[in-house]
Amino acid sequence: GTISAKFLNDFLADNNIDIGVIPIFDVKVYSIVYETVDWNGEPRQASGAIYIPDEDYSNKKYPIYSGQHGTESKRTNVASISPLRGFDALFVASVGYIGSSPDLLGLGISSDVVHPYVHAFVAEAVVDKIRATKNWICSNGINDNEQLFIAGYSEGGYVAMATHKLIEEKYADEF
């Protein structure tokens, strides 16, 4: 679906929230499923959301922002199911970024495992989600500018730092 810039601006005003930017673009939201691995190296499916500025992107290149959600225990309180749960990725898309919000293992579609709380190996699922996002946008005629921003809060802050470390140690040539 699409979330309008007007809705986003009204949401901020109605809740007296100042995020330091004003949403410009409507945002298209897509839920995706991608392959990753669990703590034993076993293949698993995971889910997440992709947020795209709703504009003519044929001659543009976008930075990618990967936002890791805070502590969550309810499987359905994730961006792939409820797009407002990927608040940060949604709002950066409204100002011209590609937003990526992974649900993480044990949440969203991956109901066959328990959500691992604050474990560094979860960074592999984030890297796989970034790859899936890059593949998805490429297959839909959208280009990234090879800039990657990773952030998170609460549990997501730890996951963001673990992802930075993993990319630096293992995937620096790719990202």
Predicted regions located by residue number:
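Gly/Ser-rich "nucleophile elbow"/oxyanion-hole loop immediately N-terminal to the catalytic nucleophile
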Residues: 52-61, 131-151, 170-174
